[in-house]
Curated annotation (Swiss-Prot):
Stated family: Belongs to the ATG3 family.
Region (Disordered): 243-270
The organism's place on the tree of life at top rank: Eukaryota
Protein's recorded name: Autophagy-related protein 3
GO BP terms, alphabetized: autophagosome assembly; autophagy of mitochondrion; cytoplasm to vacuole targeting by the Cvt pathway; glycophagy; piecemeal microautophagy of the nucleus; protein targeting to membrane
Any one cellular-component term (Gene Ontology): phagophore assembly site
Length: 309
């Protein structure tokens, strides 16, 4: 809770910057956040900007109807530890995981199936009917067990994205519910965060844009800008290599250069255009951001959020 309080104070005290440094730092301005949010809502209509309500807290550097993005009731069918365990099993890095799997197999083998003895009388048809009925009942019971287990594991999350003034990047908040709609405790929500990230990037906070107290888990944004900058650099290298290969091909086939006395005058514009083409558009920021978040919350079905209704 101390960390949460310090984070809130930092958000409050940090001045807002309106100077774009996206290409050099991976950070964005509030205006660029709105631009990226508009693109996300346009391409993936499950995401929406906030409603204007009396319960909202408003920050004056953002439009009142674009304070935060929200999507509700995103499915989460299993805990994050299950995904980590499966990865360990596939990579052969965890003997405990194998032991757990073996134990489950042994439990299945220990179930005793008692056959129904057939009568030696002429009532074979009746016995067959009973056998078939028992098989159908057994299948239905198995289906019920699987369904009940699935329902117990199923959770739903409301996801919120707002703008962090202290880090100048988007910040994610998650609020979870069980299958019956009962709010999850912070401890339960932590179960849906990858173990490696629980202590590093996840914090218990109340939603900062509501007046009422809504507990949530926030994904700390301290690394977002660095991740984005690395991605921008990689894109630039790839695009530069592609452009050089294209120029080499044109040179080999003797492609003519464009004529005109204003070629030198256009060089600066062409260089600027190449810089733009070599980078990621800022309106795609939140799409990339959500891909990063999937590594933190792998069992929350973010792919669902990238589809239309």
């Amino acid at each position: 809770m101390i960390r949460s309080a310090l984070s809130n104070w930092r958000e409050y005290l940090t001045p807002v910057s309106h100077k774009s440094t996206f290409l050099t730092t991976g950070q964005i301005t509030p205006e660029e956040f709105v631009q990226a949010g508009d693109y996300l809502c346009h391409m993936f209509p499950t995401w929406k900007w906030n409603d204007m309500a009396d319960d909202n807290k408003y920050r004056d550097f953002l439009p009142k109807d674009k304070q935060f993005l929200v999507i509700r009731k995103v499915p989460c069918s299993e805990r994050a530890q299950a995904v980590v365990t499966m990865d360990e099993i596939e990579n052969g890095t965890s003997t405990d995981a194998f032991s757990a799997a073996d134990d489950e197999d042994n439990d299945d083998d220990s179930i005793e199936i008692i056959p129904v003895s057939k009568s030696s009388s002429g009532a074979d048809n009746d016995v067959n009917d009973i056998d078939e009925l028992m098989e159908e009942m057994e299948l239905e019971e198995d289906d019920d067990i699987v369904a009940n287990k699935t329902n117990e594991m199923l959770r739903y999350y409301d996801l919120f994205i707002t703008y962090s003034t202290s880090y100048r990047v988007p910040k994610m908040y998650i609020v979870g519910f069980n299958g019956n709609g009962t709010p999850l405790t912070p401890k339960e929500m932590f179960e849906d965060i990858t173990p490696d990230y629980r202590k590093k990037t996840a914090t218990i906070e109340k939603l900062p844009f509501y007046k009422r107290n809504v507990p949530s888990v926030s994904i700390h944004p301290c690394k977002h800008a660095n991740v984005m900058k690395v991605l921008l650099d990689k894109i630039s290298v790839v695009k530069e290599r592609q452009r050089e290969e294209e120029m080499q091909k044109n040179a080999e086939v003797g492609a003519p250069k464009s004529a005109g006395s204003d070629d030198g005058d256009n060089e600066n514009w062409e260089d600027l255009q190449q810089d733009i083409d070599d980078s990621l558009r800022v309106d795609l920021y939140l799409v990339v951001f959500l891909k990063f978040i999937t590594s933190v919350t792998p069992t929350i079905q973010h792919d669902y959020t990238m589809e239309g209704w």
